[in-house]
Amino acid sequence: MKKVGFISLGCPKNLVDSEVMMGHLKQNGYQITADAADADTVVVNTCGFIDSAKKESIDTILEAAQLKTNGQAKRLIVAGCLVERYRDELKAEIPEVDAFIGTNQINDILAVADPKVNTRSLPVVPIGNQSATYLYDESTPRVLATPSHYAFVKIAEGCDRPCAFCFIPQMRGHFRSRRFGSIIAEAHQLAEEGVKELILVAQDSSRYGEDLGKQDALARLLRELSHVDGIEWVRVMYTYPTHISDAFLDVLAAEPKAVKYLDMPLQHASQNVLKLMKRGGNRQSLEQLIERVRRRVPGIAVRTTFISGFPGETEDDFEELMSFIKSVEFDRVGVFTYSDEEGTPAFDLSDKIQHRTATRRRNALMKEQAKISRRKNKARVGDVVRVLFEGESNESELLWQGRMETQAPDIDGCVLINDVPEGIVPAVGDLVNVKITEGHEYDLIGHISSHG
């Protein structure tokens, strides 16, 4: 049996693309392995978002190329966002690669995977992502790469936002939504496979359905998914601040299975920087938005990300962002130093910030957020919270772990469980009640008080 090794880098949206490619291959008789050294064909699905991601992608491709040079692998395929940005350069610099698949060519994996197919006969599909049409649907095969109790569901592809720092529109094409019925059908299929948590992802989730002429489509979708038998939690990631509707918030407040969690990258709070970023808004408008979110959805956890060191960011801009973080007290925050990406409007801006300054600002922001997170977590001591049980902890075989609804996998903390009543060890994916006994910077610790 032909064996394909998959290496998927980058975000959950890219992971879904990998799952689809693996699904096509498995459906056509290929064996899938996570061990590239044991494969006939190696597929590296790359990320091309920022410098660190590009470097990781290049290093991974070179490691895979060495497998081919050593005779362990017969074919090397490179896919994903890096291909959209640097296909010609990759082709020239890494001749070991047999085929390149862009983000609009996911279904072409079968045409290039077979080591018996002559490399010279492989199809060449030109890049043209402004006319990109690719969307998977409920009939598309997938091999889930996540733990069995949760799955990412891509509800849209592409982005039309003009953010000055971002190359994603050029890599992923224009914004386009999946059909409502297709997403619902896929949710039912995933529930039948034992998935308990659906995590809705897109480059711009809050715009879902606009291109289909549907109003409040995300709210309607979230409500419908919350009624799928077998699904316990539905989570929405990657929303945009100007598209947080009252209808969407009301569903979060009313539907028990719609988790009270809002992932909403804000990027900055200074009007000066937001204008340079081509995002608009100011601190006051963002504070009003957060106040509205918390008022309409009591108990909601708000997660956001910021960029430090954007060109033109002054010390006053930085101090305003710091003050904003202190004032709002987000539940989760990620801060990234600005990455100067060729081909973006920000690349041509003057007043570039030195990397050490951007790093200093990032570290200061994260240090302040750590204090906020620790204080909020300590305030939960004594609470009994609903936790999705995820099995043995990654930190110690003496601990179990799970997540509250306010914790997304991989990017947020977890609940470490140090005591399970005798005879009632839950199954992975079960919901259990955990009494919190300790609160730390990112994680909480507790014991199971009841199961079921």
What does each model-found stretch correspond to?
Residues 7, 79, 201-203, 237-239, ...:
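Generic beta-strand/beta-sheet core signal
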Residues 196, 232-237, 260-262, 300, ...:
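Structural beta-strand/beta-sheet cores of well-ordered domains, especially the beta-sheet scaffolds
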Residues 76-80, 85, 192-316, 326:
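Conserved SAM/AdoMet-binding glycine-rich loop
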Residues 163, 183, 200, 236, ...:
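Conserved, mostly hydrophobic/aromatic
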Residues 48-49, 172-173, 212-215, 275-281, ...:
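Short glycine-enriched, charge-decorated loop/helix-capping segments at active-site entrances
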Residues 1-208, 247, 258, 262, ...:
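Proteins enriched for Cys/Gly/acidic motifs involved in redox and nucleic-acid/cofactor modification
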Residues 260-261, 274-275, 286, 298-301, ...:
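Extended hydrophobic-aromatic, low-complexity segments
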Residues 348-452:
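Terminal RNA-binding accessory module
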